[in-house]
C-alpha cells in the first residue's frame, strides 16, 4: 500500500459535483475520490446529499483533498464547482473561492454568473457521440480530472472500472476519455482574472 504523505503545510482542495438526481453525480464523485485517495497518495473525504425524489431532485457530492489528515470533511470554500444544470449553478456559485473555477454543462446551463467559467457540452457529447445521455457524468468526470490537476487519468480509469456495471466498461471509458480531451483543450490561465480584495481601495 502506498504510504500517505506527511507534509508540514496542508494544501486543501475542494470540489463539488452538483446537479439533479439521476445524473450520476454521486457516482462520479465517488470515482474521483477513490482515484485520488485509494489509487493516489493524498488524503480525501467524500460526502453527499440529495433530495427525497428518486430522480430530478437536487443532488450534490463533495470531495475534499489534502496532503495532510483532513480535520473537517465538508467543503467550505470550493476550488472547483461542477454544475450540471442551471439550478445547481444558481444555488452553489457563491460557495466558490474568488479564484475558484466554475465548470458547467453548456447544454443545460445557459445563464452564467461569471466570465471565469468553463462551459463544455457534456450532455451533447454523451448523447450524440456515445449514444447514451447517462454517461454525461463520466464525460464531466474526465474534464474535472484534468481541470482540477488533482488526479491522473490512469487512476480515474482504475477507479471507474471498479464502480460501473459489467458490460459498460467500453462506453464509460470512452466517455471519460472524451471528457479528458475536452478538458485538455482549456487553458485556465487565459480565463479572466478573479477580482480580489486588493483590487479595491477601502
Where are these regions (language model features)?
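Active-site cofactor/cluster-binding pocket
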Residues: 2-202
Amino acid at each position: 500500500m502506498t504510504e500517505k504523505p506527511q507534509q508540514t503545510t496542508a494544501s486543501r482542495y475542494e470540489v463539488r459535483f452538483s446537479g439533479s438526481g439521476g445524473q450520476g453525480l454521486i457516482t462520479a464523485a465517488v470515482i474521483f475520490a477513490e482515484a485520488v485517495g485509494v489509487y493516489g497518495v493524498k488524503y480525501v473525504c467524500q460526502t453527499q446529499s440529495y433530495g427525497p425524489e428518486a430522480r430530478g431532485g437536487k443532488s450534490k457530492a463533495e470531495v475534499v483533498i489534502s496532503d495532510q489528515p483532513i480535520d473537517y470533511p465538508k467543503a467550505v470554500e470550493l476550488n472547483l464547482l461542477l454544475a450540471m444544470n442551471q439550478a445547481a449553478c444558481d444555488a452553489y456559485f457563491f460557495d466558490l473561492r474568488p479564484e475558484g473555477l466554475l465548470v458547467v454543462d453548456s447544454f443545460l446551463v445557459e445563464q452564467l454568473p461569471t466570465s471565469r467559467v468553463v462551459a463544455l457540452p457534456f450532455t451533447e457529447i454523451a448523447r450524440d457521440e456515445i449514444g447514451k445521455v447517462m454517461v454525461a457524468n463520466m464525460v464531466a468526470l474526465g474534464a474535472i480530472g484534468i481541470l482540477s490537476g488533482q488526479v491522473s487519468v490512469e487512476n480515474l480509469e482504475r477507479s471507474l472500472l471498479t464502480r460501473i456495471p459489467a458490460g459498460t466498461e467500453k462506453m464509460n471509458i470512452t466517455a471519460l476519455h472524451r471528457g479528458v480531451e475536452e478538458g485538455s483543450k482549456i487553458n485556465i490561465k487565459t480565463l479572466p482574472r478573479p477580482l480580489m480584495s486588493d483590487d479595491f481601495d477601502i
